[in-house]
């Protein structure tokens, strides 16, 4: 363990800092880092280098090359820069490279050098040019702050939702500030800048002068400033060689350190660990690296090469042409276990496990000592926590073996923390591999979350590793494997050197019916890449027609979209396509398309019946559908025409259509309707009252009710109403009028073609038994019993039934007998039945 702590450096009495190598860089740089614009993304992100050809000592004719590497120096992309001079580079939270040009344009590139988009920082920036720029990160996203040639600041807090803010002017500012940075306080971005010995804070409304509390006297200029990773702390480097450290609000001083170097540093960044009370700043010059904090002494390292600092959540990454290192505060658990002469529970447990492997009795002694103090649970937890903060797998295994050894002597130690740590370390070791090049620490991994890490693997097109991690962690398919396969498929469709057929087959073989994968999304990506035929092939695998059809319409494959909509059976989907086709095609082509799709034609007719009647008529005309055309004119005659002449004309057109359709019945019926309308109009003129639009039967009934019997009979003859129907109409009308005398005359006018039982029924319906009895005697023998029962003459009905010897009539009469009044009648029927059975 003494050897293990050889690279530990104390800062004061309470903290140690260590620097270890992440990778040996093999990126074959042709330029020194000082001659390049450099940007490195946090959380073990990629590195972008752009050699600066716009420097005066360089040849202006040489075009710069933008190179993108992984953190291990593996090349990811290289492209010749063909745009304007670049002032600053920076990475967004989504690992998109933002290139801020001198003219205020910001070009956005993907991790593999693919151009994504561009935006401008405004006309004022374009006119005054860009002197300096900062890319910063907030809870809203990634922002850009610009210092223009007019010494004004413009910023946007979120490049994904660009809203430019012009900051207030600094009074009397005639030259560029000596240093400046972006602060994020209360969810608002501010600019802090130094002008000589003065500091100014710019917000959206005002410019205010601020003074750091407890600043050493004699400061005439601020040379460098740095804000911490979480924007909570601020460090200021003065021309006196003092480094002031305090809160970002400039209300509280943490400490001040005299580094005895007045030369401005190349970089200054914070180096702090989450939940740690220690605060330290790392300052870099050409060949010196210094770690300073709240201690009288500093930690100093010699830099053999030109280096670049990348602030992280829990430390600082330092890379040069040959190495990539990580500097951080030693975590508390590691310090407790590994510091010299430590008697911490975790240290004793680690020793006990090592002695156990040697089969030494000292293992039992160490273990008993921990158990006697009651600290075995604490020892296991310390070893588990320390394993997470170790970079070397061998040391991770040693600590986890110690934790596992200690767990064996605990009855109820929850295994979750141990299992999760093993899983997390396996994932971390996989992504830290040189060929992957994402040197995440455990703290960064937990802050980033597994979902974001998977997204970054997908962004690097490391699909197999991402899928293996999902399967190992047993993530739900929708969040894990399915999502990654969908990304893989979207990348696959961009490979234009492979045929559409092969790409579609490969995607289907890999994806199959994987839940959570949308073939329509993949097809949309293929269409966006200009591969329409591939998109159509992919849509064949999409089971949801509601996802197929919109994209087919977007691709101008409307007829195919119509076929798919019809196959789905979703009428709303069919209507959507039909309305799209109607706007896209001319009228003739639209109708021809409908003729080839009967279901679509039927649905469109239904639509037209409610919305576009004239279009419906055109459809019938084009199809020579005279039958439906006739029906259309009949409906139109009643719906649209109010004048009798117009209605008759529409009916005449309908009759002609029916004759063309060889439907003589409909044609004759239409002509009869025309005659009836003319007659009704004449009756209204001659008799008054309301006749128009009545049916033939209602017209006859109305005439009878009005006492115009002769006209009713003439109407019946003209329209050949059968006698039975006419008698029913007249019988009903006279009964409604309660004109019993006229009804009796009518019944005696000639023999009734409907018999006399209807007379009985109608009279009883009007509650007139007296009149009903008049007609009951005239009812024929076969209906006599029913008529007598209707008028309530049960006894006579029984006599008739006995006389007819009809079992059904006897049963009918018997059902009308009541015990109190018709007992004798019931006995009479029973005796008649008995006699009939004897015979």
From Swiss-Prot:
3'-nitrotyrosine modifications at: 4
GO biological process, alphabetically ordered: autophagosome maturation; endosomal transport; endosomal vesicle fusion; endosome to lysosome transport; intracellular protein transport; regulation of SNARE complex assembly; vacuole fusion, non-autophagic
Primary site of residence: membrane
GO CC entries: autophagosome; axon; clathrin-coated vesicle; CORVET complex; early endosome; endosome; endosome membrane; HOPS complex
Pfam family, one: Vps16_C
Residues annotated as transmembrane: none
Source superkingdom: Eukaryota
Free-text tissue specificity from the UniProt record: Ubiquitous.
Compartments, record wording: Late endosome membrane; Lysosome membrane; Early endosome; Cytoplasmic vesicle, Clathrin-coated vesicle
InterPro entries the UniProt entry points to: VPS16, Vps16_C, Vps16_C_sf, Vps16_N
Iron found in the keyword field: no
Record's keyword terms, sorted: Autophagy, Cytoplasmic vesicle, Disease variant, Dystonia, Endosome, Lysosome, Membrane, Nitration, Protein transport, Transport
Region entry Interaction with VPS33A, spans: 642-736
Membrane topology note: Peripheral membrane protein
Molecular-function annotations in GO: actin binding; actin filament binding
Subunit structure: Core component of at least two putative endosomal tethering complexes, the homotypic fusion and vacuole protein sorting (HOPS) complex and the class C core vacuole/endosome tethering (CORVET) complex. Their common core is composed of the class C Vps proteins VPS11, VPS16, VPS18 and VPS33A, which in HOPS further associates with VPS39 and VPS41 and in CORVET with VPS8 and TGFBRAP1. Interacts with RAB5C. Interacts with STX17, MON1B. Associates with adapter protein complex 3 (AP-3) and clathrin:AP-3 complexes.
Family: Belongs to the VPS16 family.
Pathology noted in the entry: Dystonia 30: A form of dystonia, a disorder defined by the presence of sustained involuntary muscle contraction, often leading to abnormal postures. DYT30 is characterized by early onset and predominantly cervical, bulbar, orofacial, and upper limb involvement. Some patients have a more complex phenotype with neurocognitive impairment, including mild intellectual disability or psychiatric manifestations. Loss of ambulation is observed in some cases. DYT30 inheritance is autosomal dominant with incomplete penetrance.
Stated role: Plays a role in vesicle-mediated protein trafficking to lysosomal compartments including the endocytic membrane transport and autophagic pathways. Believed to act as a core component of the putative HOPS and CORVET endosomal tethering complexes which are proposed to be involved in the Rab5-to-Rab7 endosome conversion probably implicating MON1A/B, and via binding SNAREs and SNARE complexes to mediate tethering and docking events during SNARE-mediated membrane fusion.
Name of the protein this chain belongs to: Vacuolar protein sorting-associated protein 16 homolog
Source organism (scientific name): Homo sapiens (Human)
